[in-house]
Amino acid sequence: MRKMMQREVTYTTAQLARMKMEDGQVTAEVLEPVTLIGNLSVEQAQREINKRPEFKENPAQVVGVEPNTQLYELPLDVFLEHATVKERPAAKEEVAEVQA
């Protein structure tokens, strides 16, 4: 039996609209939803959308958010193939010894 690695990931689906003027009337053009990492409020999602280059020229307004959490699973050997090794930060005791 293969060893598996599991991780719960929370993401937010933001519903977007772009305001347009047509025949003197303001209309909302509904855009494709965008997935953002984390559990974001409408305000937080709006800040993230404003940072994206595809919305610099034609800004979009976040009209709703839907957070979702799912459990993902990956075989450990596949994870090790794709993962990068990260150095652990030095413990406080080790830092104190180096400074002494």
Curated annotation (Swiss-Prot):
Top-level taxonomic group = Viruses
Keywords, A to Z, come to: DNA condensation, DNA replication, DNA-binding, Early protein, Repressor, Transcription, Transcription regulation, Viral DNA replication
Q: Name any one Pfam family assigned in the record.
A: p6
**A biological-process GO annotation:** chromosome condensation
Where does the chain cross the membrane? none
DNA-binding region location? 1-19
**For this protein, what is any one GO molecular function term?**
DNA binding
Q: Which InterPro entries match?
A: Histone-like_p6 (IPR035188)
Q: What does this protein do?
A: Histone-like nucleoprotein that binds to the viral dsDNA and responsible for wrapping and compacting the viral DNA about 4-fold. Forms a nucleoprotein complex in which the DNA adopts a right-handed toroidal conformation winding around a protein core. Binds ito most, if not all, the viral genome, although with different affinity, the highest one corresponding to the genome ends. The formation of the nucleoprotein complex at the genome ends, activates the initiation of viral DNA replication. The binding of p6 would recruit the complex formed by the TP and the DNA polymerase to the origin.
Q: What does the UniProt entry state concerning the protein's domains?
A: The N-terminus is involved in DNA-binding.
Tell me the protein family, please: Belongs to the phi29likevirus histone-like protein p6 family.
What protein name applies here?
Answer: Histone-like protein p6
Native organism is: Bacillus phage B103
